[in-house]
Amino acid sequence: MCASLNEVKKNETYGVSQKGYNDNFSESEGVLHGSKSMPTSMKNMLQSPTMVNMCDILQNKEAANDEKPVIPTTDTATAGTGTEDISSTQSEETDQNSHLIASEILEGTFKDISYKEYANFLGNDNNNQVLTEFVKLLSPLPSSLLETLFNLSKSIYFIAEAQNIDRILECLSKEWIACHPNTHWKSGYKSCHIVLFSLLILNSDLHNNFQVDHKKIKFSMVAFINNTLRALREENEYEELKIYSREHLIIEELSEYYKTLNETPLPLCTESRTSINTSDNQSSLKRFSTLGSREFSTSNLRSVNSNSTTLYSRDGQVSVREMSAKSNKNFHNNHPMDALYLKESFDDGLITENGSSWFMDDLILISKKSLPRKYSKRDKDQVAAPKMTSKRNKSFFGWLKPSKTTTLIEHTSRRTSLSYLNKDSEWERVKIQVKEGRIFIFKIKPDVKDIIQSSETDSATIDYFKDISSSYFAYSLLEAEAHVVQDNIIIGSGAMKSNVCNKNTKRKSGNFTVSFPENINGPKLVLEFQTRSVEEAHKFMDCINFWAGRISPVPLTQFEAVSNAEYGWSDKILTEHASLNLKNIVVSEWKPLLGLELLYEDAKDVEMVELKERLKELMNFTRQLGIWIDKHNEIKDKLVEIWSFDDNYFEAVMNNWNSRYLYMNNQYKKRLSYLKALQKAMGSVQF
C-alpha cells in the first residue's frame, strides 16, 4: 500500500529512519548498558553526565557533534524554472509539517514512531525545525526554570540519549530567554541551559533508587548550589554578561529549586497521557523568589544536610521525632505540662475562643505518611516503614529509566511533605487542638463513626478523644512554622490551569504544613494537614505561627557569638590580606550554632517575656538581620578577589559564604512569619 500524503510529508520533514536514532555513536564512545526491563532501543545509552563532569560535557558537546556522521535528508529542488517559488513553497510546507508533527508529539498522537522515541526524535540533528516548533507549543513558558522543566517532563516521555536530551534543553533555554528577557539571567541562554542540566542531575541524585557499586550520601542543598555555580562560572557568557554580579539572587533561586525538587520529583509522561498531571497537581509548583526577594521558604541549613523532610531519616528508617518527649510523657500520663509562655490578663478571655490566634480546634485530616507512630496504643500503629535505599546513582539520566510504576512520584511520595501534590495520598482523621504553645493531635480510630463535636479543653473531653484515638501526641511549637500550601502553589498555563482550578474549586479544601526544626533529639519534621477550606487553613497557620513566635526567642546568639575559627572573612583577612601568607590560613567549615532553645523541648531556661516585648524583639531583630544580610552581600566581591589565587581555598570560602547566606535568609523568612502573626493577634487585644 502507498503511504498517505501526511506520512510522506512527515518523512520529508524529519528525514531520518526510525531505526537511526541510536546509530549516531562512534564505537569509541562510552555506553551505559540498560537493564532487562528497558526498551530494546534503550539498552545502549551514551554514558550519562554527572555533577562532576557536567561542565566538560557542556563544553565538549559541540566538538562531539562534529564527529558524528551526517544523516542524509530529503533533497530540496532548486533548479529549473521558478526555483525561488519552488523553494519558498517547499519551505512553507516544511514549516507546516514540522508544526503538525510537533503538535502530534505534544498530544501523544504521532504514530510514526513509539511515544518512547519522541525525545530521541526531537533531539536528532536533522529535526531541529520540529524541535523548535515543539518548544514553541509549550510557550508561554513559566518564569521558573524548574517549572519549565516540569512542564517539559509532563509533555514528553523524557527517556532519550544524552546528547538528544541536551539539544532539547538547549532549545528550551533559548525559548525561555526569549519569553523572559528581563531576569538576572539577561540573555544568557547557555547559563539557563546549565541550570536545567544541573536540575536533571539533581533529580536523578535525589530520587533514583537504582543500585550502584558504591554508596554515597545524596547532594545537600549547598553542594548542589556550589556545583551549579562552579559550572556557571566556567561559562564565558556568565562573565561577559556580568551575571555573577547578581549571584546572590541565583543562590536564592537554586535553593528554592532544590527544596521543591527534593519534595516533588520530575514526572514521567505515559502514552495515554492519563498520568501526566498526576492528580492535576503536578501542574502546580511552589512559588519561586527568582527576583531576589528574601521571601522564600524556610529551611534550617543544618537540616538540609539530611534529605529527610518528614519522619524518615537519611537511611530510610522510621525516625520518630523526640523533641516533645516531655510533653508527650506528661500528656499520656495526664500530668500537668509546664507553661511555655508568660500568661497575661488578656489571655484568659481568648485562650478558649475557637478560630482565634489563641486557639484552634477541629476535626481535620493529616497526611498518613507524615503521621507520627510513637506512643501508639496498638501494635499495628507501630509498624516500621520499609527500608529505602540511599545509594546514589552516578548516572545523570538514571531517573529516566522505566520503573514499575507509571510515575516516579509513587516511590518517593513517602518522603515528600506535600501530599496535596499526589492524588494517591492517604489521609487519616485527626482531632487537632492548638493552644498555649503546643499542638495536640488525636488520631481517630477508623471504626469510630459518630464523634462528639466539642472544642472544650477540660480533662473529660480530652479523655474522650484519647479513648476514640489509636494514638495521640503533643508537640511544642518552639521554633515551629506553619505554611498554607495553596499560598505556595503557582498554576501553570493552558489546560493545566483549567484542570487545577476546576478540581480545587470543586473540593474547596485547604492544606497547611507544620515544620519542626532539627534539634538535638531528632531530624526536621513536617506534618501536613487538610482542612475543609483554605480560610480554615489560614486560621491554623496564624494560630501556630502566633504561638511559635510568642514562645521562641530571637536567635541573637547565632549572629552575635564571636568564633575563633576562620571562615574566610575575618576583619584581619579583609583588611590585612595583602601582608598575610594566605596559604597558611586554616579555613574552617561554617555551620550555624545549635541554640540552647533547641536543646530542650520544654526549656525552662528560655526566658518568658510579655507579648509586647516579644513583638518589639522581633521587629528589631528582623531589621538588624536585614542589615547583616546586606553586609554579607557586600563582602562577596572582596572575597572573590582575595581567595581567587587558589581553587581549593576559593571553593571553601565560597561554600561558607553561601551557607551563611542561606541560613540568614531562612531565619529572616521565619521571623517575618512570626512577626506577621503576632501583629495580627495584637489587633484583637485590649491593653
From Swiss-Prot:
Role played: Guanine nucleotide exchange factor for ARF3 required for localization of ARF3 to the bud neck and tip and involved in actin patch polarization.
Sequence similarity: Belongs to the YEL1 family.
All copies of domain SEC7, residue ranges: 57-264
Protein known as: Guanine-nucleotide exchange factor YEL1
Modified residues (Phosphoserine): S293, S299
Residue numbers of Phosphothreonine PTMs: T290
Location of the PH domain: 412-551
Compartments, record wording: Cytoplasm; Cell membrane; Bud neck; Bud tip
Keyword Magnesium found: no
Organism: Saccharomyces cerevisiae (strain JAY291) (Baker's yeast)
InterPro entries, A to Z: PH_GEF_YEL1, Sec7_C_sf, Sec7_dom, Sec7_dom_sf
Keyword Membrane carried by entry: yes
Alphabetically ordered keywords of this record: Cell membrane, Cytoplasm, Guanine-nucleotide releasing factor, Membrane, Phosphoprotein
Any one cellular-component term (Gene Ontology): plasma membrane
A GO MF label: guanyl-nucleotide exchange factor activity
Biased amino acid composition, Low complexity: 73-83
GO biological process per UniProt: regulation of ARF protein signal transduction
Domain of life: Eukaryota
PANTHER family: GUANYL-NUCLEOTIDE EXCHANGE FACTOR
